[in-house]
């Protein structure tokens, strides 16, 4: 794939852009093998990849420049603003909307926030796209409420020109620090969430709920985990760090009770909405810290299978030891950081790595997702 931003040295986010995707995958597999080191792996499955461009469903744009000449993108190598509205990672309709949002900010006369002077109002524009419907959630991250009337004044025209915009909100982030969003969310539309569907499973996206940025590869990740769980035929399952419930909902059926734990309340609301839409009453989702849940009194009945999908920091020593002590038949570990994955796998005792599969969730970058199936030592022979 060719990218003008990369070729001109304006953006280096896609560090591997100059290499064919096949070569990128070989490098990523080699890195994963190196990080896992001496850990024995029974089966290394072929990597899963998706489209090379037009796949990304989320844009995080820094707003720079001036109210009369705003720029949506990133600071360039020389510190000057770089407009990323034509980034080829985004679908064409998303690029068109990003370009229009530049004009919207100019018409509204909202001064971009200047970090060097701690002045201005508009810090970021966050745009999320539903792949199934092509609808958008648009968020303006502001320093204060002062610019909200300007947004409301121009919003009717924007919604008329781009009817695919379903959700619009303002996020207030008043502090002068490198933080993407604040606590308060003010909706400017009646709708407060996007609808998404992966593999026939209804999923929902709210402003603060984490959602995978590559829908095609994410749907295959969830489907693979569900297939592995189905092969195990467990009678109970936990989905820790569950987000909007993607893994647990894909595994759910009328005979499999699922407990999903996630610290972000908005994500849990999405998961509960999905469970209701699926007509399943044996799914339980709670807004709790996953480690605290596993260490607490609620976790006395150990499930047969535990899925963990932690943030980049991994699950950590305490939870690794707890899972080892629990001794479920299987642990499925989905990781976006192979370095912390390797550390955690070395700390989980009594299990063998039955399968490892790389999912190229972030083409052209160094990042990737890994799915691991860990089987209890005594259970390996019967489950293979």
Curated annotation (Swiss-Prot):
Belongs to the class I-like SAM-binding methyltransferase superfamily. RNA M5U methyltransferase family. RlmC subfamily. NCBIfam families: meth_trns_rumB, rumA. It is an enzyme of class 2 (transferase). This is 23S rRNA (uracil(747)-C(5))-methyltransferase RlmC. It comes from the Bacteria. Catalyzes the formation of 5-methyl-uridine at position 747 (m5U747) in 23S rRNA. Its EC number is 2.1.1.189. Keywords: 4Fe-4S, Iron, Iron-sulfur, Metal-binding, Methyltransferase, rRNA processing, S-adenosyl-L-methionine, Transferase. It holds the Pfam family tRNA_U5-meth_tr. Coiled coil: none annotated. It catalyses: uridine(747) in 23S rRNA + S-adenosyl-L-methionine = 5-methyluridine(747) in 23S rRNA + S-adenosyl-L-homocysteine + H(+). It comes from Shewanella amazonensis (strain ATCC BAA-1098 / SB2B).
């Amino acid at each position: 794939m060719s990218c003008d931003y990369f070729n001109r040295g304006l953006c280096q986010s896609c560090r591997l852009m100059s290499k064919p995707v096949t070569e990128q995958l070989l490098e990523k597999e080699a890195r994963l093998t190196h990080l896992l080191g001496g850990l024995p792996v029974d089966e290394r499955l072929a990597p899963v990849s998706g489209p090379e461009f037009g796949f990304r469903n989320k844009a995080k744009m820094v707003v720079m420049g001036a109210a009369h000449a705003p720029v949506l993108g990133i600071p360039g190598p020389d510190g000057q603003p770089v407009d990323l509205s034509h980034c080829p990672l985004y679908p064409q309709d998303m690029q068109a909307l990003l370009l229009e949002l530049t004009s919207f900010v100019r018409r509204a006369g909202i001064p971009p926030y200047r970090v060097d002077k701690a002045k201005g109002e508009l810090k970021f524009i966050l745009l999320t796209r539903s792949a199934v419907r092509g609808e958008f959630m648009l968020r303006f991250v502001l320093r204060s409420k002062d610019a909200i009337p300007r947004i409301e004044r121009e919003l009717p025209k924007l919604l008329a020109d781009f009817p695919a915009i379903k959700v619009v909100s303002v996020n207030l982030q008043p502090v002068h620090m490198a933080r993407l969003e604040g606590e308060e969310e003010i909706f400017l539309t009646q709708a407060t969430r996007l609808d998404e569907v992966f593999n026939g499973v209804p999923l929902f996206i709210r402003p603060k709920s984490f959602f995978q940025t590559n829908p095609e590869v994410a749907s295959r990740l969830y489907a693979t985990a569900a297939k592995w769980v189905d092969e195990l035929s467990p009678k109970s399952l936990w989905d820790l760090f569950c987000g909007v419930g993607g893994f647990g909902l894909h595994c759910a059926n009328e005979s499999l009770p699922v407990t999903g734990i996630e610290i972000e309340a908005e994500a849990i609301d999405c998961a509960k909405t999905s469970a209701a839409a699926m007509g399943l009453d044996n799914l339980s989702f709670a807004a709790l810290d996953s480690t605290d849940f596993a260490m607490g009194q609620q976790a006395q009945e150990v499930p047969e299978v535990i899925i963990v999908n932690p943030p980049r920091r991994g699950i950590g020593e305490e939870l690794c030891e707890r899972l080892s002590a629990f001794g479920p038949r299987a642990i499925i570990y989905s990781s976006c950081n192979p370095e912390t994955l390797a550390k955690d796998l070395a700390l989980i005792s009594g299990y063998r790595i039955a399968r490892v599969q790389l999912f190229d969730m972030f083409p052209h970058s160094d990042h990737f997702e890994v799915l691991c199936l860990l089987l209890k030592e005594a259970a390996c022979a019967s489950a293979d």
